[in-house]
From Swiss-Prot:
GO terms, biological process: ubiquinone biosynthetic process
The protein's name in its UniProt record: 3-demethoxyubiquinol 3-hydroxylase
Compartment(s) of residence: Cell membrane
Described purpose of this protein according to its UniProt entry: Catalyzes the hydroxylation of 2-nonaprenyl-3-methyl-6-methoxy-1,4-benzoquinol during ubiquinone biosynthesis.
Keywords assigned: Cell membrane, Iron, Membrane, Metal-binding, Monooxygenase, Oxidoreductase, Ubiquinone biosynthesis
Pfam families: COQ7
Lineage: Bacteria, Pseudomonadati, Pseudomonadota, Betaproteobacteria, Burkholderiales
Documented EC number(s): 1.14.99.60
Similarity-based family: Belongs to the COQ7 family.
CDD domains (UniProt xref): DMQH
Protein source organism: Cupriavidus taiwanensis (strain DSM 17343 / BCRC 17206 / CCUG 44338 / CIP 107171 / LMG 19424 / R1) (Ralstonia taiwanensis (strain LMG 19424))
Length: 207
């Protein structure tokens, strides 16, 4: 029962945007930069950071479901450790959205529920499949973060610092999942994941 209460609290905090980071925000060492951007640039960056915030909401749901369904204690611990770092990402993105005068996606409850269901299915398929799903997810997230870094205005050093640290963490999570025995996913599954990601990013940029 205590575990269920704890996991329910994690879900509520992720959806509500009340997550706190354990690590310092990478942007804290940089000066404020929103005044150096035009209104259009701020709207664009806010859209990108809202996408990244949604991605971290989904990451919380995925890791939570996969942690609950893991057979092996070491795999469960690995999922939990990665989820804690993803909480940092979630808090950093939320803070940056506030700096930009924007807000998280209104569809966060939907994103969370969908990601939890996917993570549960992956977890029930076995630890190797679950780890493979983590590895592929992180590979796609790494690619998507690289695209966002290319699309940031040159003056936006704070978002850049956050996304660069997030990308480094995602690469490490993916490598760890592969090293722990994650199996490669079939091409149709990878394509389906990319399609779902496109739907999410298109909607989250605006809503």
């Amino acid at each position: 029962m205590d575990t269920l209460i704890k996991e329910f609290d994690v879900a509520l905090r992720a959806i509500a945007g009340a997550t706190r980071s354990a690590r310092a925000n990478p942007a804290d060492r940089l000066a404020p930069d929103t005044e150096q951007m035009s209104a259009e640039e701020r709207r664009h960056v806010a859209g990108l950071m809202r996408i990244n915030h949604v991605g971290e909401v989904c990451a919380q749901a995925l890791y939570q479901a996969q942690k609950l369904t893991a057979r092996n204690g070491a795999v469960r611990a690995q999922m939990d450790a990665a989820a804690r770092e993803e909480e940092d990402h979630l808090a950093w993105c939320a803070e940056r959205l506030r700096e930009l005068g924007s807000r998280p996606s209104l569809l966060n409850p939907l994103w969370y529920a969908g990601a939890f269901a996917i993570g549960w299915v992956a977890g029930r398929a076995g630890d190797r499949v679950s780890l493979g799903f983590v590895a592929e997810t992180e590979r796609q997230v790494e690619h998507h973060l690289g695209g966002h870094l290319d699309r940031l205005p040159e003056s936006d050093s704070r978002s850049r610092a956050i996304l660069e640290q997030m990308r480094d963490d995602e690469i490490r999570h993916g490598d760890a999942a592969r090293e722990a025995g994650g199996m490669p996913l079939p091409a149709p599954v990878r394509a389906l994941m990319r399609g779902a990601s496109r739907v999410m990013t298109t909607a989250a940029y605006r809503i």
